[in-house]
A protein has these predicted regions:
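Catalytic cores of enzyme domains
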Residues: 1-113
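Alpha-helical scaffold domains
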Residues: 69, 73-173
Length: 173
């Protein structure tokens, strides 16, 4: 119901890709409605972007808002974003099919580092952003969207010591 592909063998932590081969392969049988009565993803979604009929309102999806959307994030959704700077994946994290998934062994798909402090990101400038996230998918959202997301997460954190780092962006264009 989270609208992502679910494999009974691998769960829903998947990349959709295509490989061109000079041979024919046997088609898999698509599975339909692997979710049954489970609504865990709908229940956990912070913005209520998921619906029981397996539809999503991307305008409310935190992954869409923090990765794809380039405008100002609606005020009504900012608090629900919490500390998320790039994506969400709450719906994937709770999916029971992921009990079958295994961590990747491909180093290119691993996170760069564990959680960084918001202050670390608030001290970035555009050049450092490009250097730090070189060869990371985060680079593609661009500096403006990245710092927008960091500022929202910083505001949501209510960490008073971030105030001075946030203030420099009040007149930033």
């Amino acid at each position: 119901k989270h609208t992502n592909i679910v494999s009974k063998k691998f769960g829903s932590w998947l990349f959709l890709s295509e490989i061109f081969l000079p041979i024919s392969l046997e088609n898999d049988n698509p599975s339909i409605d692997n979710c049954g009565s489970c609504n865990d993803c709908i229940t956990i979604c912070p913005t209520n972007a998921l619906y029981k009929d397996s539809k999503i309102d991307a305008r409310k999806c935190i992954s869409y808002l923090t990765i794809e959307y380039k405008g100002p994030i609606p005020i009504s959704l900012r608090e629900k974003i919490g500390n998320k700077v790039y994506g969400c994946d709450d719906c994937l994290s709770i999916c029971p099919w992921n009990k079958f998934s295994e961590p990747t062994r491909q180093k290119d798909f691993l996170a760069l580092e564990k959680e960084k402090e918001l202050k670390f990101f608030l001290n970035f400038d555009e050049n450092f952003f490009k250097k730090y996230f070189f060869q990371s998918p985060i680079l593609r959202i661009g500096w403006v969207s990245f710092i927008r997301n960091v500022l929202i997460a910083s505001g949501n954190s209510q960490i008073k010591s971030l105030s001075s780092s946030i203030k420099k962006y009040l007149t930033h264009r």
